[in-house]
Curated annotation (Swiss-Prot):
HAMAP family: Asp_tRNA_synth_type1. GO terms for cellular component: cytoplasm. Homodimer. This is Aspartate--tRNA(Asp/Asn) ligase. Aspartyl-tRNA synthetase with relaxed tRNA specificity since it is able to aspartylate not only its cognate tRNA(Asp) but also tRNA(Asn). Reaction proceeds in two steps: L-aspartate is first activated by ATP to form Asp-AMP and then transferred to the acceptor end of tRNA(Asp/Asn).
């Protein structure tokens, strides 16, 4: 028999009345009624009410014991009276009359009063009564994790990962681990570097993704690979991005098309989202080209819950009487229109605040608006410069109705798309147009293969350099590089990018040509990607893959606004682990072993 417990704190029911039981857990709440003390004992599974009578010799001990101390009790189960039943907990019909108490571990506050004050205050948060600054929560994460909501997020994460793993195995995928210490790669973010003691002056890199390894597995003859892969990128924190490390459902398949991968991911994620959320899950995963996404939504991560669609109204304003937009168009710029339903009767301050916000927060320049009264009359600072024919074209292009308004953004094409997209998001939120009770997915496809980098003044890869271009080698040789599309795709849910993937290039001549366009010599390719180049000489199957982000999936299903809430031991926004004190300085002898020196 277990000396610590016969039952968990969630198990006991009315049919256990008169049984002698032993329970262990944390002293969660305590209520002193003079001759009786009621204690809520909490373990991982639930809560049970304990009753301590003042005729017991341990009454003073429990009276003075601090909350969150760990105890073991033995006692008799009794039914609560009808008026004291607690329906909010599963054990609410019973209580345990304690006959024996053993203190396993008592809370002891730090001798420094300032630190002790901090420790006492953070204990209060465990009952859910008060929130604390993120750094304090992370410093005492072992206490923060005792909170029901935080604990449930970590349990949910475990359950989701188990379900993903089960579904992958059901579909014939093999779980294979790839190296953590590897070579630096041009994934687009900064690497975390690890110095080699045995090879002075050389460094390993923590993998930004298992990209090359999973392609090598396909070359090796494995048909379907997956792993819950840890990835490491030295990036700044965001609400949907944790600094340092993250996890993804990394997978790769041989002899597949883009649609084959879509079908696997759609069926997998639909089952996971439907199982772990009470929200509706849209079964439709529409395919939207990158070009269409940037035009209609102003983003390659569109939130399809937002019904607003952006329109291109450049031609309507060409040669118009509104000189600001007319001049912009003559200089090669565009004009985008964003509808704002049922806002025509809003005061002018409503529109001025939106424009001011867009200017300050989005860097917007050419902005304006038109309101269309219920009788159809157009008003606003732009309306007087447009004839009725142009106004009708705006009504048709934006599909608005009387009583609606339209915001406009004019700039270079990419900038105008970005600004219009942010205005669309702002309006969708402030006008309460977004349904928070549904998950809507979409695929973004046909990304550009290359992009012109204004800073370096050269062509570079838009996304993954190992993807297959549309048209293969012929397009690389014959087309303007900026017109070439790639078999690359992103999966988006409610405006959050869950995953990127691609059909891979499996031919050396295409690889060399693509990298040549991006400014890499054949020798540089051989040096930087030697393993892949060697492998590609020995028969490479057509293959492709994808890697949905586990942290973001859990964040969405937990309905948390910040990804750090679903990570067990997260870093703060500065990339610091305040619990363990990382990053930290190391001793000089360790640096000497690694042939390193810190320059102040």
């Amino acid at each position: 028999m277990n000396c610590y417990k016969t039952h968990t704190c969630e198990e006991l029911r009315k049919n256990d009345v008169e049984k002698e039981v032993t329970l262990s857990g944390w002293l969660y709440r305590k209520r002193d009624h003079g001759n009786l003390i009621f204690v809520d004992l909490r373990d991982f599974y639930g809560i049970t009410q304990l009753v301590f009578n003042n005729d017991k010799d341990f009454f003073d001990e429990i009276s003075n014991l601090k909350l969150e101390s760990v105890i073991t009790v033995t006692g008799i189960v009794e039914a609560r009276t009808e008026d004291t039943v607690n329906s909010s907990i599963s054990t609410g019909e019973i209580e345990v009359i304690v006959n024996n108490l053993r203190v396993e571990s008592e809370v002891e506050f730090h001798f420094d009063e300032e630190i002790a004050k901090e420790e006492r205050s953070i204990l209060v948060s465990i009952t859910g009564e008060q929130e604390y600054p993120e750094n304090m929560r992370f410093k005492y994460r072992f206490l923060d994790l005792r909170r029901e909501k935080v604990r449930n997020n970590i349990i949910l994460r475990s359950q989701i990962i188990a379900e993903l793993r089960k579904l992958m195995i059901e579909r014939g995928f093999l779980e294979i681990q790839t190296p953590i210490l590897t070579a630096s790669s041009p994934e687009g973010a900064r690497d975390y570097l690890v110095p080699s003691r045995l090879n002075p002056g050389k460094f390993y890199a923590l993998p930004q993704a298992p990209q090359i390894f999973k392609q090598l597995l396909m070359v090796s003859g494995f048909d379907k690979y997956f792993q819950i892969a840890p990835c490491f990128r030295d990036e700044d924190a965001r609400a949907d991005r944790s600094p340092g490390e993250f996890y993804q459902l990394d997978l790769e398949m041989s002899f597949v098309t883009q649609e084959d991968i879509f079908q696997i991911i759609e069926s997998t994620l639909y089952r996971v989202f439907a199982k772990f959320s009470r929200k509706s899950v849209d079964k439709d995963f529409p395919r939207i080209t990158y070009k269409e996404a940037m035009l209609k939504y102003g983003s390659d991560k569109p939130d399809l819950r937002n019904p607003l669609l952006i329109s291109d109204v450049t031609e309507i304003f060409r040669d118009s009487g509104f000189n600001i937009f007319k001049s912009n168009i003559e200089r090669g710029m565009v004009v985008r229109a964003i509808p704002a339903p049922k806002t025509a009767e809003e005061p002018r301050s409503f529109f001025d605040k939106k424009i001011e916000h867009a200017q300050k927060e989005f860097g917007a320049k050419g902005l304006g608006y038109i309101t269309f009264d219920k009788d159809g009359t157009a008003k606003g600072p732009i309306a007087k410069f447009l004839d009725e024919n142009r106004l009708n074209h705006i009504r048709e292009a934006t599909n608005i109705e009387p009583g609606d308004s339209v915001f406009f953004a004019s700039d270079k094409e990419n900038e105008a798309a970005n600004i219009a997209g942010k205005v669309r998001t702002l309006l969708g939120s402030e006008l309460s147009l977004i349904d928070d009770n549904i998950f809507r997915f979409c695929w973004i496809i046909d990304f550009p293969y290359f992009v012109y980098d204004d800073k370096s003044k050269k062509i570079d890869f838009f996304h993954n350099p190992f993807s297959m271009p549309h048209g293969g080698l012929k397009d690389l040789e014959d087309k303007n590089p900026l017109d070439i599309l790639a078999y690359q795709y992103d999966l988006v849910c409610n405006g959050i990018e869950l995953s990127s993937g691609a059909i891979r290039n499996n031919k050396l001549d295409i690889m060399y040509k693509a990298f040549a366009i991006a400014g890499y010599s054949r020798g540089e390719v051989d040096t930087r990607f030697g393993a892949l180049v060697r492998a590609f000489r020995f028969g490479v199957p057509p293959h492709g893959g994808i890697a949905p982000g586990v942290d973001r999936i859990v964040m969405l299903l937990a309905d948390e606004p910040n990804i750090r809430e679903v990570i067990c031991f997260p870093m703060n926004q500065q990339g610091e682990d305040v619990l363990m004190g990382a990053p930290s300085k190391v001793e000089d002898k360790h640096l000497r072993e690694l042939s390193l020196k810190v320059i102040e």
